[in-house]
Each structure stands twice: as structure tokens, then as C-alpha cells.
Amino acid sequence: EMTSSLVGSEMCIRDRSWLLYNFLSGAMIQLDEENKSIYEQILQDDAYASEKALLTENGFLVDYDELAFIRVANKRACADKKTLSLLIAPTMGCNFSCPYCFEYHRAGVMSKEVQDQIIQFISDSVKKNHHEHIFVYWFGGEPLLAADIIESMADRIMTIANSNGIQHTSAVVTNGYLLSEKILRMLEKHCVERIQVTLDGVGQINDASRMLHNGEGTFETIMENLSRRTTINIVVRSNISKRNMEHYGELYSYLVDFNKKYGTNLTLYPARMEVYHNSKTGKDEKLSQEEFFKYLGERGFLSTQKINDAKFVSCTAERFHSYAFDEKGNVYRCWNDVGNELMSFSTVDQLLRDNGKVKTRNIVPYLDNGYQFDDECLRCKLLPVCMGGCIMKRNFMKERTCTPIKFHTDDFVLRKFFKESDTSKGGEIHDADC
């Protein structure tokens, strides 16, 4: 028996014109007043065969359990072997003292022994699972404090990829302070396609929360480093809190002018400042989801973000072939856990022994995501593009993290409609996709 899709959205886009959007199939259908009337009658009427066929083809009418389909798709996506996804922290040390930082900083860098074990693990996994792609996220701490280790390990990973005829790409999360000309060119040569640098505002606004250990500011040095042209896509993340939210527009304008002046192509990404149990920042500075997305939406800062296709995974943490390594060789699922040895589920040495001991309590919550959706998620039309949000926050912090589309659904759907109708144009600086 045919029923209406649980993940379809209906909205009026102009006088006597309606738009249907399906978050599972990604299909859009525009209806005039006559067809809207047919659409409302179609389930009760055996006529309209061609109209029913169109709606069925695009997912607006279904004869199967969509939630069961999403769960099955989630399991298949999590087990997919195409990409071996790795986060590697060559050091957990850092040269900054950011009060909101969630990371577990400590001195020291990755030993040669641990480096060798990780490289051996990558080589073994490629041979065993026939991966088509190795993706590495260089993380920390501040990873560029160990740039020599990145260079050495990246050389060896490139050799593995080349000898097996597969693709290798990587990205770096850095505070940008050490992103010198020499290091930037080294990263270009080692398959780095994306660098994320955080700025919390312009000048002193940034320096109030992102400073060196001696309290000195960092903004000028970071911007000097970002002025260099590069083939790497550089994303500027801005952690927005009650303290700096009114200065986000200033940063946006500053980067537009900066791109024009230096011929760069910096991309801006607004992020809600998070407060973790090991953060020094008080919860009173944190914006709620509603406050955060309302602020961005009312000021047009979501205008270049777009709707994701159905992805069936919330993040790489729930993929079977995804691993995060700290400098000691501890292995984690979530990069927010890296350095917190209590959340490690194994060590690289144990993984190499194949049947090594695994701490089940630290891995099951990430690998069983599809069966942990609560009633609100199960009722939400956005489930296919959100998949329940951050697993770590939901399971360990009992906090919901929703997509911004939830708070501005009509705006997102309309932008997609007008873009695909070739009636909208991009701006000079773009926000990252949600």
C-alpha cells in the first residue's frame, strides 16, 4: 500500500505555487494550484496513474519502510571498504592556550616505533580490504609542531598508495601560526587538499581567545601565513560564542577584502563554540543551537550553505574502516576523544596482532548508531541528511546536535530550487557546506 514519504517537505514558494522536496531522494517537484489539488487527492483515488508514477519514482509515495531502509543504508555505508580514513596526531603538544580547547595537551611527539606501526597497519589494511583511497587527517595538538613527522609519514603513505595503484589525499587541522612558506610547500607536495585554520575574529577579538602560552596575540602572524597563494583549499573556521558573535560579520567582511587583496580563496566556516568537560570556558558563553542558527540565519550567513545529499552516516567515527591515532599509538573512533586514553578502544600494536584486545564499551556506541535514534530523530524529515548528528555528544554528553537545515528548512529548500533553476549566483566568499 502506498503512503506519503516520511522525509518529504511541502512548502508554498509563491502565490498559487508549491514545492515538494524529498530529503532521501533529493528530488524536487513544483506544483501549480491544479496539481496541488491532485496531489492532495492522489492517495484516495485510483486515477492519476501517471502522477502517482512520478511521485513514486521521486520518493514522495512509498510502499516500503523508509526508516528500515535508512538503517540498512547506514549499515552498508559504515561497512564500505572504499576509503581507509585515518586521523593521525603526531603530537598532542600545542603552542596556543585557547580557553575553550577540548584537546588533551601533553609534551612529546610520536616515536619512530609508533610511526612504523601505523604505516604497517595502513599497508596491511590496503592489502586485506582492497581500499581504493587512503584519506589522512593530520591533527593534534598542533600538528605542525611535528611537521617533520608529517613529511616522513606522508612520504611512506604516498608510496603505499602508489604501489597499490590507489588514491591518497589528506587534510590538516592547524592553528596556522607555524604555516610558513616552507611548510606550506611541503604540504602541497604531500597530497594535502585542505587546511583548516581557526580565527575567532579580527585582531584583538581573535587574540582574546587564541593566544600563545605567554599571552601574546596570534592574528597578525596567522594572516601573514594565509596571504600566500596555494593550490590547497584553506577553510577558516570561526568558533562563535556569546563573547564574539557580534564580531562575526566583521571577520566575514575582512576575509572578503583579504581575498581581493592577496588573490587568495579563503572559505569561511561558522562553528558553534562547544564546551567540553575539560574546557576552561564557562557554559555561560555557549550559544544554544537555536540561538546560533537564528543569529546566522537572520544575518544571511547561511545563505551560501546548501542541503547535503542523503549520506547515511553522521560522521567517519561510525565507519568500520576509520581510525584515529594519538602520538602514543592509542586508537580512537572520535577525534574529540584523541588524547583521552580512557576513550581509546585499542592500540595500533594490538590492531597489528589482529585479535588484540578491544574495549567494547568505547567502540560499540559509534558502530551501532543507526539503532540509537530517539523518537525526535525518527520523526524528523531531515534524518537522511543528518543521521542523528554527533554520536559522541548524543551518547556521552546526552546532547542533541541538529543540522542548521532544521531551523531554516524553507530557506534551504528555496535556495536549492532557485540555484537549480539558474536564478541565483554565488558570492565572493563562501561558507562551507553544512
Which stretches of residues belong to each language-model region?
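Radical SAM/AdoMet-radical enzyme domain recognition
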Residues: 119, 123-137, 146-273
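Iron-sulfur (Fe-S) cluster-binding segments and ferredoxin-like electron-carrier domains
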Residues: 101-113, 338-341, 383-414
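Single conserved hydrophobic/aromatic residue that forms the stacking wall/gate
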Residues: 1-8, 13
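Short Fe-S-cluster ligation motifs
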Residues: 121-140, 402-434
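C-terminal accessory region of radical SAM enzymes
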Residues: 284-310, 336-387
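N-terminal [4Fe-4S]-dependent radical SAM core
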Residues: 14-30, 49-87, 129
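Flexible glycine/acidic-rich beta-alpha junction loops that bind and position SAM and/or redox cofactors
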Residues: 204-209, 265-286, 308-315, 338-348
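N-terminal pre-triad scaffold of radical SAM enzymes
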Residues: 75-104, 119, 123, 128-137, ...
